[in-house]
Curated annotation (Swiss-Prot):
Protein name, UniProt field: Large ribosomal subunit protein uL5
UniProt cross-references to HAMAP family, sorted A to Z: Ribosomal_uL5_B (MF_01333_B)
Family of this protein: Belongs to the universal ribosomal protein uL5 family.
Origin species: Chlorobium luteolum (strain DSM 273 / BCRC 81028 / 2530) (Pelodictyon luteolum)
Coiled coil: none
Name of the coding gene: rplE
Length: 194
């Protein structure tokens, strides 16, 4: 009987985009903006992924599938988000579960960023580049994804309903221009400026 051999990945190994950031992006940013101190160079701090399931009030099963899908995509257990106040028009009670969220940091963040840029974004229908107008003025970038099926971890045959998500890239950049250059250097496929 043949023995299984597993190749273990060292726990101290860096993610591909983390290595890219340390070796190339920091140099490009310091040359462009003239940073004197390494600690002033903007970095990606966290990625927050949020799925809002408004129909969870009438169909609680949809929230369960959204939680499972978000766990598959990120490799981390999602936090359930509850409504803060009751809204009768939406048949929503205070404290009712209406969504889920995951916050990724460090290695998991860079691995998700790698999968997002390399695998998921090219699978977006009619993709012509990400808009550069979604910066918030403080160096953070948020994108709305309409379909969770762009991620290869999701099996299209097993999902009951296509739902979207909001992905926020939080950086330590002070301005939107710094954040734009940081994300573009990391490989974020923005629309070409004329």
């Amino acid at each position: 009987m043949a023995q299984k051999t597993e190749t273990a990945i060292p726990s101290n190994s860096k993610a591909r985009f983390e290595t890219l950031y340390r070796e190339k992006v920091t140099k490009a940013l310091s040359e462009r903006f003239g940073y004197k101190n390494v600690m002033n160079i903007p970095r990606l701090q966290k990625i927050s992924i949020n799925i809002g399931v408004g129909e969870a009030a009438s169909e609680p099963k949809l929230l369960e599938t959204a939680i499972q899908e978000l766990a598959q995509i990120t490799g981390q257990k999602p936090q359930i988000r509850k409504s803060k106040k009751a809204i009768s028009n939406f048949k929503l009670r205070e404290g009712q579960a209406i969504g889920c969220r995951v916050t990724l940091r460090r290695k998991a963040m860079y691995e998700f960023f790698d999968r997002f840029v390399s695998l998921a974004v090219p699978r977006i229908r009619d993709f012509r580049g990400l808009s550069d107008t979604s910066f918030d003025g403080r160096g953070n970038y948020t994108i709305g994804v309409r379909e969770q099926i762009i991620f290869p971890e999701i099996d299209i045959d097993k999902i009951p309903k296509i739902c979207g998500m909001d992905i926020s890239f939080v950086t330590s950049a002070k301005t939107d221009e710094e954040a734009y250059v940081l994300l573009a250097e990391l490989g974020m496929p923005f629309k070409k400026k004329n």
